[in-house]
């Protein structure tokens, strides 16, 4: 049952709105920073090695541990941490919109979980980042955490590849080939992150932030800001 729930959470049809966002890709395509298969795959690989998605995975695991130990104060701590590391309004709103949507949907799926979800919400406040909400789901439904974060990364990668297929544009087979070729890096990323201490968390995302900022003045957009 837990495995099926995980597949539901990371499915592209799960109504969180992830498909609405390009995470800076629209400007990078227009400026020729990511305009063909090789540069796009390199950009995704750099995200997995150095980007904020690594920190998100580590925080998902920390949320699972915090709920298991009853340390609910950690929810607010890590939610605030994520808020402070989102360098543009667009990226911050994306994470919060998806997180709030996930918490609401979890309560709609299983009314028996609403008291626990409500207790988590009290600690977090009105704005819940997606990594926090995902960690809560993994903890409350007792999903194996290693498989969960593999799914988290695979879902993130699939959504951005879908955006790249539309924007660059790429063929569907090219997009699937990118996902296939980056799967070993997903595994490597998870294996590295599970051993990280808090002081080791980092992200080098200034390029992403600059691209995201340029979305505000970009003439033509397909995705949400």
Swiss-Prot record:
Q: Work out whether the entry's keyword set contains Chaperone.
A: yes
The record, for InterPro entries, names: UreF, UreF_sf
Give the GO cellular component terms, alphabetically: cytoplasm
Q: Keywords in UniProt for this one?
A: Chaperone, Cytoplasm, Nickel insertion
- Keyword Cell membrane attached: no
- Please state where this protein is localized: Cytoplasm
Principal localisation: cytoplasm
Q: Per the UniProt record, which residue ranges are transmembrane? A: none
State the coiled-coil residue ranges: none
GO molecular function terms noted in the UniProt entry? nickel cation binding
Q: Which domain of life is it from?
A: Bacteria
Q: Residue span of the signal peptide, if any? A: none
- Hey, which family's this protein in? Belongs to the UreF family.
Say what the protein does.
Required for maturation of urease via the functional incorporation of the urease nickel metallocenter.
The annotated subunit structure for this chain is: UreD, UreF and UreG form a complex that acts as a GTP-hydrolysis-dependent molecular chaperone, activating the urease apoprotein by helping to assemble the nickel containing metallocenter of UreC. The UreE protein probably delivers the nickel.
What protein is this chain from?
Answer: Urease accessory protein UreF
Which organism encodes this protein?
Picosynechococcus sp. (strain ATCC 27264 / PCC 7002 / PR-6) (Agmenellum quadruplicatum)
